[in-house]
């Protein structure tokens, strides 16, 4: 592959810069094998989350938006239409909250969407201060969208039926 997106971000101050010619549709990502996608604002938050929850991390897909734009999410889902569950792990601030609502509305109704809100401003802050967080309560989970449940019709098979001898009331 060839580079399509690059950016610089500061962790101490509000420094954000995208490289010249960077395409927001191609965010920092890991493509896993299962049908779950975890979405973050910045690569540092994505990596911090994996550090906090390393178990089977390779199975899941992870995507950094490079902010709160939905371009990278739409591009990722166009490449991976088999994704069934999206976890929006955006920052715990107004911009993150507003983006979660907007992004959830963009996703098809067949996709389950859950907001995973960090207990601090972002996932890097949670990682840095994890020793101070009681009982590893690093986040709260909020379901934003669930696909409609399909109504199934029960099928009775002959093999499941019970054979009962019947006595005729009259003979034909």
For each feature predicted by the language model, list its residue ranges.
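Phosphate-handling DNA/RNA-contact segment within nucleic-acid enzymes
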Residues: 1-79
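TOPRIM fold recognition
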Residues: 51-172
